[in-house]
Amino acid sequence: MKIGITNDHRGVKKKQLLTIFLTDLGYTINNYGTDTEDSVDFPDYAYKLGRAIQNNEVDLGIAICGTGIGMSIVLNKMKGVYCAKVANVSEAILSKSHNDANVIAISEEMDDFTTKEVIVKFIETPFSNVDRYVLRNEKIKDIENA
């Protein structure tokens, strides 16, 4: 599985941690973020990951900034990109099992243990295919295409 990771200047260390962690688990990582802690504009880096999702360059995405909120706002403006701003394991699981999210946005302030747990649960959780969630996600796509 290919996973894209993007980040702004505040997420460099967290990206480095996750790149090593996920590579050790056997995932292929594509880097769409900055590698420097010099101030950058997060929309530029969110957009790079969003385009990678749209072009099927990666299967899933991880976006890291100060809070995760800015990245999630940008990513959710992009057709076919469904980003969940997640703060805990439960939200990571539900973002996939109910909402079929293909990108997760996290805060660089999340502790490393929780970060690893959240990311693994996001990657490993399948969409449930329960009728009500399928219908709700179809409605989201209808709104997206309106």
Language-model-derived ranges and their functions:
Residues 1, 5-24:
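Glycine-rich phosphate/diphosphate-binding loop of Rossmann-like nucleotide-binding domains
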Residues 2-3, 57-61, 80-82:
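Short active-site oxyanion
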Residues 6, 30-32, 61-65:
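Short, conserved beta-strand edge motifs with alternating hydrophobic and charged residues
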Residues 6, 10-13, 89-146:
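C-terminal binding/interaction regions
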Residues 21-29, 80:
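Short helix-loop-beta junction
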Residues 28-39:
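A short beta-strand-loop structural module common to alpha/beta enzyme folds
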Residues 45-63, 67:
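Short, structured active-site "lid" loops
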Residues 64, 69-108:
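Mid-chain, well-packed structural core segment of small domains
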